[in-house]
């Protein structure tokens, strides 16, 4: 029972923004964020290095850069958003929450625009292939 409680508390901390970002991705692509984007190329998932491998990976590179630009804000925070038809609307009045939401919104739109260009060979891509020098944000 104690283990279940620890897992529940841990998930509460993880759930906020990652869950909402996943909803945005699903809304724009029809795909599962976890299965399609959590370990893709050199930048989709935790960390990132090297040269983005394709347009989808470049979406993740830009997303990482965006998070870097919202200094002082915690990127895993929960924020207010809504979906209207195909649009994603960030509605939070808190400047940090709004900025993080905008980073996620732009990335989800980018994934949607490139949904047919992603290549399965970049799923679970080894970071050992990500050694080329990265472009600047």
Curated annotation (Swiss-Prot):
CDD domains reported for this sequence: PLA2c
Annotated signal sequence range: 1-16
Disulfide bonds: 42-130, 44-60, 59-110, 65-137, 66-103, 73-96, 90-101
Catalysis performed (reactions): a 1,2-diacyl-sn-glycero-3-phosphocholine + H2O = a 1-acyl-sn-glycero-3-phosphocholine + a fatty acid + H(+)
Post-translational modification as stated in the protein's UniProt record: Glycosylated (2.5%).
Cofactors, names only: Ca(2+)
Residues holding Ca(2+): 43, 45, 47, 64
Tissue-by-tissue expression: Expressed by the venom gland.
Keywords on record: Angiogenesis, Blood coagulation cascade inhibiting toxin, Calcium, Disulfide bond, Glycoprotein, Hemostasis impairing toxin, Hydrolase, Lipid degradation, Lipid metabolism, Metal-binding, Platelet aggregation inhibiting toxin, Secreted, Signal, Toxin
UniProt-annotated catalytic positions: 63, 104
Enzyme's top EC category: hydrolase
Enzyme Commission number(s) of this protein: 3.1.1.4
Free-text comment on the cofactor: Binds 1 Ca(2+) ion.
Localization: Secreted
GO BP terms in the entry: angiogenesis; arachidonate secretion; lipid catabolic process; phospholipid metabolic process
Pfam families tied to this protein: Phospholip_A2_1
Functional summary from the UniProt entry: Snake venom phospholipase A2 (PLA2) that inhibits blood coagulation and platelet aggregation induced by ADP and arachidonic acid. Inhibits tumor cell adhesion and migration in a dose-dependent manner. Abolishes the attachment of human brain microvascular endothelial cells (HBMEC) to fibrinogen (IC(50)=0.12 uM) and dramatically reduces its adhesion to fibronectin (IC(50)=0.12 uM), whereas no effect is observed on type I collagen, vitronectin or laminin 1. Also blocks the cell migration toward fibronectin and fibrinogen.
PANTHER family referenced in this protein's UniProt entry, alphabetically: BASIC PHOSPHOLIPASE A2 PA-11-LIKE, PHOSPHOLIPASE A2 FAMILY MEMBER
Further details from the record: Negative results: does not show cytotoxic activity on human fibrosarcoma and melanoma cell lines.
Assigned protein family: Belongs to the phospholipase A2 family. Group II subfamily. D49 sub-subfamily.
Protein's UniProt name: Acidic phospholipase A2 CC-PLA2-1
Organism: Cerastes cerastes
Lineage: Eukaryota, Metazoa, Chordata, Craniata, Vertebrata
């Amino acid at each position: 029972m104690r283990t279940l409680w620890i897992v529940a508390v841990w998930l509460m901390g993880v759930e906020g923004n990652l869950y909402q970002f996943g909803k945005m991705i699903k809304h724009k692509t029809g795909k599962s964020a976890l299965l399609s984007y959590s370990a893709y190329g050199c930048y989709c998932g935790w960390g990132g290095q090297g040269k983005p491998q394709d347009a989808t990976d470049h979406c993740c590179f830009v997303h990482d850069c965006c998070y870097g630009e919202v200094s002082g804000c915690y990127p895993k925070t929960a924020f207010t958003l809504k979906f209207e038809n195909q649009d994603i609307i960030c509605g939070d009045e808190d400047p940090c929450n709004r900025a993080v939401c905008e980073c996620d919104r732009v990335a989800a739109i980018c994934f949607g625009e490139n949904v047919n260009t992603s290549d399965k060979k970049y799923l679970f891509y080894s970071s050992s292939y990500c050694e080329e020098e990265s472009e600047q944000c």
